Amino acid sequence: MAHSS
Protein backbone atom coordinates (compact mmCIF):
# COMPACT_ATOMS: atom_id res chain seq x y z
CA MET A 1 0.00 0.00 0.00
CA ALA A 2 1.27 3.46 -0.89
CA HIS A 3 1.44 6.11 1.86
CA SER A 4 -1.48 8.55 1.76
CA SER A 5 -2.66 11.27 4.18
UniProtKB/Swiss-Prot annotation:
The top EC class, named as a word, is transferase
Q: Which cofactor does it need?
A: [4Fe-4S] cluster; [2Fe-2S] cluster
Catalytic activities: (4R,5S)-dethiobiotin + (sulfur carrier)-SH + 2 reduced [2Fe-2S]-[ferredoxin] + 2 S-adenosyl-L-methionine = (sulfur carrier)-H + biotin + 2 5'-deoxyadenosine + 2 L-methionine + 2 oxidized [2Fe-2S]-[ferredoxin]
* GO terms, molecular function: 2 iron, 2 sulfur cluster binding; 4 iron, 4 sulfur cluster binding; biotin synthase activity; metal ion binding
E.C. number(s) listed in UniProt: 2.8.1.6
Q: How is the cofactor bound?
A: Binds 1 [4Fe-4S] cluster. The cluster is coordinated with 3 cysteines and an exchangeable S-adenosyl-L-methionine.
Q: Which domain of life is it from?
A: Bacteria
Which sequence ranges form a coiled-coil region, renumbered to this chain? none
Record keywords:
2Fe-2S, 4Fe-4S, Biotin biosynthesis, Iron, Iron-sulfur, Metal-binding, S-adenosyl-L-methionine, Transferase
Question: Per the UniProt entry, what are the Gene Ontology biological process annotations, in alphabetical order?
Answer: biotin biosynthetic process
Asked whether the keyword Cell membrane is assigned, the reply is: no
Q: In which pathway does it act?
A: Cofactor biosynthesis; biotin biosynthesis; biotin from 7,8-diaminononanoate: step 2/2
What family, per the record?
Belongs to the radical SAM superfamily. Biotin synthase family.
**How is the subunit organization of this protein annotated in UniProt?**
Homodimer.
Q: What does this protein do?
A: Catalyzes the conversion of dethiobiotin (DTB) to biotin by the insertion of a sulfur atom into dethiobiotin via a radical-based mechanism.
Which named protein is this? Biotin synthase
